[in-house]
């Protein structure tokens, strides 16, 4: 049985000259004039929605073509689009919220949390037979989501400083009241009742604000992965899509066979596991879901690959996913590449590298870092030329 997949990607909008985040998403979308793109809470980001695909190859081609269209439209405006959890050169303001009634209400309700929503993620949708299956599968896949976050970690910088984290986006995201691990529910009715209670509490206003790491889609018969940073390289999105499809296929198979759930419903450790993944990405240790103990990231991820091999083979994905995982572990995380660019050049070089990878370029370590700006007025672009301030531990954002 074919289990179809799709992806949503969010992109930062940056000024090519300064490398800074700019609130020009509306202008970019107006210039595109195409379906499949949308606005986000902040005017500094746009979203794309893929078509539904049977194969990872089809998903890769779709995402790559979408990125090329976005890049071309942005270039005509002196802009670039960047797929990453954060961009290094940004300023927090309350004036960049998208002109939309719902978004304005969110900005009023959540204030600084909404103002600092200068982050982007990638979301993966996997087909499920029905909503009950989606809800029951959530419990089984949840322990394996932090390793997927580690693979996508691409946000070490925040407001011009190195946070010490591989995914600072995760730290920002977890401040929303419903962000974090999903609970375990016996049926869609149980889940829907619990979510209705959250809405009735007044803390959130609608189902669109259910920001758990994984959730059943409100509009499609899919299970949606939401824990990941946006990924500079399309290959990373495809790798995660392949692994998540296998997780869902494996969970559905176990439910159909009446196998004992692989999750006891106690998810307290999962928040700690997500923190560990956000802190060090694939360069450090992760919490191994099989043992709930720390282990080197490559060990955890290769163990995950072995565990999911039958499900990967059922989708025809095993060889591709194994190759992509080997390449990801050899290349290191996006966070590692970005820190190297900052160390060798500056934060503008980081933005240049992100934009190049987003459009599909795979450059030698310093090839994206050679751009020099013409002389400008005193003080202009100072932040763009400044070298990064390093921090081995997180500071207070903003």
Where are these regions (language model features)?
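C-terminal accessory/tail domains of diverse enzymes
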Residues: 1-77, 106, 173-389, 394-398
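An acidic- and aromatic-residue-enriched active-site/binding cleft used to recognize and process polar
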Residues: 16, 79, 84-89, 122, ...
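Short amphipathic alpha-helical patches
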Residues: 35, 72, 94-98, 161-172, ...
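Well-ordered mid-protein domain cores that form the structural environment of catalytic cofactors
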Residues: 54-120
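Metal-dependent DNA replication initiation modules
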Residues: 84, 88, 101, 106-122, ...
């Amino acid at each position: 049985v074919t289990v179809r997949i799709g992806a949503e990607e969010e992109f930062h909008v940056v000024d090519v000259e300064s490398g800074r985040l700019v609130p020009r998403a509306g202008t970019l979308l107006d210039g595109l004039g195409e379906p499949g793109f949308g606005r986000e809470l902040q005017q500094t980001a746009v979203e794309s929605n893929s078509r539904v695909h049977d194969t990872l190859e089809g998903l890769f081609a779709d995402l790559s073509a979408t990125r090329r269209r976005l890049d071309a439209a942005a270039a005509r405006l002196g802009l670039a689009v960047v797929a990453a959890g954060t961009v290094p050169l940004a300023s927090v303001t309350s004036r960049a919220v998208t002109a939309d009634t719902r978004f304005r209400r969110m900005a009023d309700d959540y204030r600084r949390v909404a103002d600092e929503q200068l982050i982007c993620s990638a979301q993966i949708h996997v087909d499920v037979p029905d909503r009950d299956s989606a809800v029951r599968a959530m419990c089984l896949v949840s322990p394996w989501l932090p390793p997927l976050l580690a693979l996508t970690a691409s946000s070490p910088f925040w407001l011009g400083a190195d946070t010490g984290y591989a995914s600072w986006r995760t730290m920002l995201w977890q401040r929303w009241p419903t962000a974090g691990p999903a609970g375990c529910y016996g049926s869609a009715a149980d889940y829907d009742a619990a979510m209705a209670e959250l809405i009735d509490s007044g803390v959130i206003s609608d189902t669109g604000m259910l920001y758990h790491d994984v959730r059943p889609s409100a509009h499609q018969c899919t299970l949606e992965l939401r824990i990941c940073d946006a990924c500079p390289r399309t290959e990373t999105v495809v790798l995660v899509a392949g692994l998540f499809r296998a997780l869902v296929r494996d969970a559905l198979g176990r439910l159909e066979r009446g196998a004992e759930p692989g999750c006891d419903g106690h998810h307290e450790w999962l928040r700690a596991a997500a923190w560990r993944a956000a802190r060090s990405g694939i360069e450090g240790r992760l919490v191994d879901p099989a043992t709930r103990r720390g282990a080197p990231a490559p060990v955890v991820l290769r163990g995950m690959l072995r565990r999911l091999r039958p499900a990967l083979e059922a989708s025809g994905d095993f060889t591709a996913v194994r190759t992509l995982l080997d390449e990801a572990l050899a290349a290191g995380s996006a966070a590692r590449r970005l820190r190297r660019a900052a160390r060798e050049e500056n934060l503008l070089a980081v933005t240049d590298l992100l934009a190049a990878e987003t459009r599909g370029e795979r450059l030698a370590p310093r090839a994206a870092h050679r751009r020099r700006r013409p002389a400008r007025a005193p003080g202009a672009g100072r932040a763009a030329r400044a070298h990064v301030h390093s921090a081995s531990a997180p500071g207070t954002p903003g």
